[in-house]
Amino acid sequence: MAPNLRKSHPILKMINNSLIDLPAPSNISAWWNFGSLLGICLLTQIITGLLLATHYTADTTLAFSSVAHTCRNVQYGWLIRNLHANGASFFFICIYLHIGRGFYYGSYLFKETWNTGVILLLTLMATAFVGYVLPWGQMSFWGATVITNLFSAFPYIGQTIVEWAWGGFSVDNPTLTRFFALHFLLPFMIAGLTLIHFTFLHESGSNNPLGIVSDCDKIPFHPYFSVKDILGFMLMLLPLTALALFSPNLLGDPENFTPANPLVTPPHIKPEWYFLFAYAILRSIPNKLGGVLALAASVLILFLAPLLHVSKQRTMAFRPLSQLLFWTLVANLLILTWVGSQPVEHPFIIIGQLASITYFLTILFLFPLTSALENKLLNF
């Protein structure tokens, strides 16, 4: 009998073991769909990004008009740009839900998978930041100025780092050129890191909503989860297309329709919505270096998740107190996101400071304490 090519061919065998005959827990819910959705987001962003790059000019005198030209004169250029800009928002929605799922169900106990995931998040944030600068509108320019300037808070070496990053003494043509180079490179780095993330995941197999070993009850990935994933693709691509077609500028900043002008500062400098929670934490500390450290800590704190796990149970499925705390943390992040979009004045300053304290307090102290209490309650 001839060998099955799918199982014997060196490359097809790898694909088969990852996407077809992969043993998957039978009880994973729709919360496990976001990994594949992130893959589709990445693919969409790379394709639309490549098409945009063919019409873009990375020069301060031409960048803004080249983007306008793409939207006005290129066949479906407006659609490609709108899909790319809003695709970034969907990318972040999916990654935040994916991280939330991992946090709720204790997936962070697969340490290597979790750590590569956090590195992926950081790379995605860097990609989105440099990408936002490329249209060279007012918010692009001032966003780049404000965020790169944060590095000057580091003692002794700070100013040198900033000027090195800028390629001069202010955000100018060299900055735009290198940001375009980085924005082109980073998505491919993300794709490479995704394969590493994938490799680590397939070493241990997927977690499941019960957080128990499911080796005795696994089903093949195809057709069960491949079909479920395709449903997920439809449910994500439909709102993305609707947003790109009906309200493409809903999540953007009107300030970015004005070409960059170093002599006019916008009244409210703020990043895209997906960075607002971190921006709120940055702003809530009156000291520059302190703010920068808090900003970094707000994301890097995810690396500590496996170390802060003290519960005897893996997931929060049967831990009502931790569940309450988890949803409080979600609400807290939504408050931070809202505060980040507001001007720096009373009462937003104090709300931001309280929400920032609560954010760190919840993750670093309240979760471990609650878990310890729940462990005690198990004995009754």
Swiss-Prot record:
Binds 2 heme b groups non-covalently. SUPFAM superfamilies: a domain/subunit of cytochrome bc1 complex (Ubiquinol-cytochrome c reductase) (SSF81648), Transmembrane di-heme cytochromes (SSF81342). Heme b b566 binds at H98, H197. Keywords: Electron transport, Heme, Iron, Membrane, Metal-binding, Mitochondrion, Mitochondrion inner membrane, Respiratory chain, Transmembrane, Transmembrane helix, Transport, Ubiquinone. A ubiquinone binds at H202. Component of the ubiquinol-cytochrome c reductase complex (complex III or cytochrome b-c1 complex) that is part of the mitochondrial respiratory chain. The b-c1 complex mediates electron transfer from ubiquinol to cytochrome c. Contributes to the generation of a proton gradient across the mitochondrial membrane that is then used for ATP synthesis. Heme 1 (or BL or b562) is low-potential and absorbs at about 562 nm, and heme 2 (or BH or b566) is high-potential and absorbs at about 566 nm. CDD domains: cytochrome_b_C (cd00290), Cytochrome_b_N (cd00284). Signal peptide: none annotated. Its cofactor is heme b. This is Cytochrome b. The chain crosses the membrane at residues 34-54, 78-99, 114-134, 179-199, 227-247, 289-309, 321-341, 348-368. The keyword Metal-binding applies. Pfam families: Cytochrom_B_C (PF00032), Cytochrome_B (PF00033). GO terms for cellular component: mitochondrial inner membrane; respiratory chain complex III. GO terms for biological process: mitochondrial electron transport, ubiquinol to cytochrome c. GO terms for molecular function: metal ion binding; ubiquinol-cytochrome-c reductase activity. The gene is MT-CYB. It comes from Sphyrapicus varius. The cytochrome bc1 complex contains 11 subunits: 3 respiratory subunits (MT-CYB, CYC1 and UQCRFS1), 2 core proteins (UQCRC1 and UQCRC2) and 6 low-molecular weight proteins (UQCRH/QCR6, UQCRB/QCR7, UQCRQ/QCR8, UQCR10/QCR9, UQCR11/QCR10 and a cleavage product of UQCRFS1). This cytochrome bc1 complex then forms a dimer. Heme b b562 binds at H84, H183.
